[in-house]
Curated annotation (Swiss-Prot):
Domain of life: Bacteria
InterPro entries named in the record: MPN, RadC_JAB, RuvA_2-like, UPF0758, UPF0758_CS, UPF0758_N
Species the sequence originates in: Vibrio parahaemolyticus serotype O3:K6 (strain RIMD 2210633)
UniProt-listed GO biological process terms: proteolysis
Sections of the chain in a coiled coil: none
NCBIfam families according to UniProt: PRK00024.1, radc
This protein's name: UPF0758 protein VP0184
CDD domains per record: MPN_DUF2466 (cd08071)
Motif JAMM motif location, chain numbering: 173-186
Alphabetically ordered keywords of this record: Hydrolase, Metal-binding, Metalloprotease, Protease, Zinc
């Protein structure tokens, strides 16, 4: 179908303006980003083809430059645009989180941590350093690689927490396997960190394990 043949209210841009972005399908949202189709496909057909070819919208967004650019209708300019959009989204989430209380917006916290960690190919140990009002002072990745009791050093965590004058921490790490269920090693590491930080009156408020499309909160499980 030629895009111009669609009723005006069915055109992605007009539909968004009339009904809001939540009313659009993944393909329609992507079509707005792509702007133009290719020979033989209008922009919505191209968007739908790309989502099916990559497997999902998220897999398209997390593709490498080489994977992205080898697809019909895409190229380096679109890749750069997409990376800019994703970075702006991440910065928006970070700014929103840092302006509020990390505990009163747990879903926002999960969303932000997922955006940082979900698609990483290696395990990464991430910390939110909070003040006594539970506002974010600083966030950083402290360890990367295969995380176990030997590779996450409580002394280094304590050192960074004192450096930032933190009153509390929220921990997070990803499981590249995609399975968010915490391991026994995850629980042991968390307990060691709780004990080490208690010596300097710093609390761990939660530890999130980030998987593929899901996350597990230690606090919600009653483990903290």
């Amino acid at each position: 179908m030629i895009l111009k043949a669609l009723p005006n209210e069915s055109m992605p841009r007009e539909k968004l303006l009339q009904r809001g972005p939540q009313a659009l399908t993944d393909a329609e949202l992507l079509a707005i980003f792509l702007r133009t189709g290719t020979q033989g496909m209008n922009v919505i057909e191209l968007a739908d083809f790309l989502i099916q070819d990559f497997g999902s919208l998220r897999q398209l967004f997390s593709a490498s430059e080489q994977e992205f650019c080898q697809h019909k209708g895409l190229g380096q300019a679109k890749y750069v645009q997409l990376q800019a959009v994703l970075e702006m989204t991440q910065r928006y989430l970070a700014e929103t989180l840092k302006r509020g209380d990390a505990l009163t917006s747990p879903e926002q916290t999960k969303l932000y941590l997922s955006s940082i960690l979900r698609d990483r190919q290696r395990e990464a140990f991430y910390i939110l350093f909070l003040d006594n009002q539970h506002r974010v002072i600083k966030d950083e990745i402290l360890f990367e690689g295969t995380l176990d009791a030997a590779s996450v050093y409580p002394r280094e965590v304590v050192k960074r927490a004192l450096h930032h004058n933190a009153a509390a921490l929220i921990l997070a790490h990803n499981h590249p396997s995609g399975v968010a269920e915490p391991s026994q090693a995850d629980r042991r590491i968390t307990r060691r960190l709780i004990d080490a930080l208690a010596l300097v009156d710093i609390r761990i408020l939660d530890h999130f394990v980030i998987g593929d499309g899901e996350s597990v909160s230690f606090a919600e499980r009653g483990w903290i």
